[in-house]
Regions:
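Active-site-adjacent mobile loop/cap segments within catalytic or ligand-binding domains
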Residues: 109, 135-187
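Active-site/substrate-binding loop(s) of hydrolase catalytic cores
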Residues: 1, 7-132, 155-157, 181
Length: 187
């Protein structure tokens, strides 16, 4: 997922490059450039209603007021964008989801999965355990797709260099191949 917060879209070139990459035999990649097109256009964290979509999922949801930059919306899945993500994830049941954010420069996973740790090594970012905020897409995915892994890649502020994009593409492809039981070195 390239961009759930409209002002954190450095993942878009990674998604674009993955789309241009050769397919990995035996792997189905679903690439979503932006979950938040209104926020992306306005360069805001929230959507057109000012809701932080990554606080609008039902797992551990709690109401966060509209005055906060982390506004959760009036109820879980109140926003059309989070409902679309829910429908996609429910339909596709991905075994692995990677969510790009900015600007903390790390890879985070509450479960400390080997996939997330390997991703961090490939791209040269620190791995940190994720303290999961309320109502996040990653927590919802893990709770609703049996055996699913979902983690956060926090990119640096500003655009990525061509070299950085290539590293992230390699890391995504390695994670996808590994998740499918393939030899990551061959992909």
């Amino acid at each position: 997922m390239g961009c759930i917060h409209g002002n954190e879209c450095a993942g878009l070139p990674i998604i674009a490059q993955l789309r241009r990459s050769a397919p990995i035999a035996g792997v189905e990649l679903w690439l979503v450039p932006s979950v938040n097109p209104d926020g992306w256009r306005a360069h805001t964290r929230g959507n057109a209603h000012g809701v932080d979509l990554n606080r609008n999922f039902s797992v551990a949801w709690r109401r966060i007021p509209r005055s906060s930059r982390y506004s959760s919306g009036p109820r879980p899945f109140s926003e059309p964008e989070s409902r679309v993500v829910r429908a996609l994830v429910t339909r596709m049941t991905p075994s692995l989801s990677i969510w790009f954010h900015q600007p903390e420069r790390n890879v985070r996973d509450a479960d400390r999965s080997p996939q997330a740790q390997r991703y961090a090594r490939i791209v040269g970012l620190p791995f940190l355990p994720l303290v999961t905020p309320p109502g996040t897409a990653t927590a919802w995915t893990k709770a609703n797709v049996r055996g699913a892994q979902a983690f956060v890649v926090e990119l640096a502020s500003g655009p990525l260099s061509v070299t950085q994009v290539r590293r992230h593409v390699r890391a995504v492809r390695t994670a996808a191949a590994s998740e499918a039981g393939l030899n990551p070195a061959e992909n």
